[in-house]
């Protein structure tokens, strides 16, 4: 199945049903008074995280989604039925953004989590609502309000503990193959990896973490060079980044310069992402003599002014990979669980009709005297 991690859709909540003007008419009760019922509320639109999905491809072809309209009110104080909601399943890790305002409506990170993205219209009020001691036969009603319409941008951000960064052919896919059961394509040409890959690493029994491999970055990626930076968003939820550097590139470029390119592109994309914990992992040490390796590593660390952890591995042989994974696992265990991490409280999403019913009732009651004057000396006709 094709991997699609970004789509644009439109969601239409259902309109509210109209209120009814009706009067009670029964045998021996010629003037029974108003009995028009309210309409039904329009259906809402929800997104729901479904762990059985891993792509947004379905919404590439089906882009318009509309909830059901509320039914109109009827006589005998019968309220119209509420419109049915619609629930759109999305993969865990999906973020919903309002295209018009740029407002992030929410993130769906757990299976079964729901997010309302469009609120149905409020029901219209029947004429029963407007009766009073001085207005016994009101001919007032309100129509249901239209449901909200939102153009949405859905972005899938993979849920992983560790993310891999590096130039093309730095050995990221080889590394993830050596430490997990993931089998991304590996070849000796750039951009072999075209989509993100996930792997589960198990350094010890009952211990595991998820690692994400994304396509490599090149200079100018922020301006769209290569595959651009579209896949960097998949690292935003990672708690640790592993920056893989090829110590012996086949084109004999400077490893330090390649590392600086990645750091610069990361900072251009998101300063917040650039501040995440990042470890330097020097790969392909098996292509050099042992005495050359340490010398080149020291030069690289000095050139980058690197003061963080540094690891040397040969991903193809698996040398150093297990030790690195154990260190990663130990580090992750020192961090708070993702569910208990402190997050800034998001502002509540404002929906169009949250206070509509209070405003309508206040407005109608304020205008009640004017309506009574209009009804003076008017003959009331009762009918079924």
Curated annotation (Swiss-Prot):
Gene name of the encoded protein = obg
Q: Identify the HAMAP family for this entry.
A: GTPase_Obg
**Residue span of region Disordered:** 72-94, 358-384
Required cofactors, per record?
Answer: Mg(2+)
Q: What domain of life?
A: Bacteria
Report any Pfam family annotated for this entry.
MMR_HSR1
Query: What does the UniProt function comment say about this protein?
Result: An essential GTPase which binds GTP, GDP and possibly (p)ppGpp with moderate affinity, with high nucleotide exchange rates and a fairly low GTP hydrolysis rate. Plays a role in control of the cell cycle, stress response, ribosome biogenesis and in those bacteria that undergo differentiation, in morphogenesis control.
Q: For Mg(2+), which residues are the binding ones?
A: 173, 193
Q: What is this protein called?
A: GTPase Obg
What compartments host this protein?
A: Cytoplasm
Q: Is Cell membrane tagged as a keyword?
A: no
């Amino acid at each position: 199945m094709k991997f699609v991690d970004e789509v644009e859709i439109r969601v239409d909540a259902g309109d509210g049903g109209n209120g009814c003007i009706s009067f009670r008419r029964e045998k021996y009760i010629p003037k029974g008074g108003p009995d028009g019922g309210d309409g039904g509320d329009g259906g809402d639109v929800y997104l729901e995280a479904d762990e059985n999905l891993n792509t947004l491809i379905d919404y590439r072809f089906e882009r318009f989604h509309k909830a059901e309209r509320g039914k109109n009110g009827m006589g005998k104080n019968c309220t119209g039925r509420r419109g049915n909601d619609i629930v759109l399943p999305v993969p865990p890790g999906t973020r919903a953004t309002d295209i018009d305002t740029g407002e992030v409506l929410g993130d769906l990170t757990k299976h079964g989590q729901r997010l309302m993205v469009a609120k149905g219209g409020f029901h219209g009020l029947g004429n029963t609502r407007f009766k009073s001691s001085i207005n016994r036969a009101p001919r007032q009603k309100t129509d249901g309000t239209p449901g909200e319409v939102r153009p949405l941008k859905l972005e899938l951000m993979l849920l992983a503990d560790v993310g891999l960064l590096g130039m093309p052919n730095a050995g990221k896919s080889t590394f993830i193959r050596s430490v997990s059961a993931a089998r991304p394509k590996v070849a000796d040409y750039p951009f072999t990896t075209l989509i993100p890959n996930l792997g589960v690493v198990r350094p010890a029994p009952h211990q595991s973490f998820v690692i994400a491999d994304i396509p490599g970055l090149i200079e100018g990626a922020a301006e769209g060079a290569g595959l651009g930076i579209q896949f960097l968003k998949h690292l935003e939820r990672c708690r640790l980044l592993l920056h893989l550097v090829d110590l012996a590139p086949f084109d004999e470029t400077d490893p330090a310069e390649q590392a600086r390119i990645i750091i610069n592109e990361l900072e251009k994309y998101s300063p917040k992402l650039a501040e995440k914990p990042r470890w330097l992992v020097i790969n392909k040490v098996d292509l050099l003599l042992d005495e050359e390796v340490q010398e080149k590593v020291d030069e690289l660390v000095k050139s980058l002014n690197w003061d963080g952890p540094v690891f040397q591995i040969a991903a193809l042989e698996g040398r150093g990979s297990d030790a690195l994974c154990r260190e990663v696992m130990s580090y992750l265990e020192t961090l708070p669980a993702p569910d208990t991490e402190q997050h800034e409280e998001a502002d509540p999403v404002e929906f169009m009709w949250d206070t509509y019913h209070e405003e309508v009732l206040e407005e109608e009651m304020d205008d009640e005297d004017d309506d009574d004057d209009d009804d003076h000396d008017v003959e009331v006709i009762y009918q079924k």
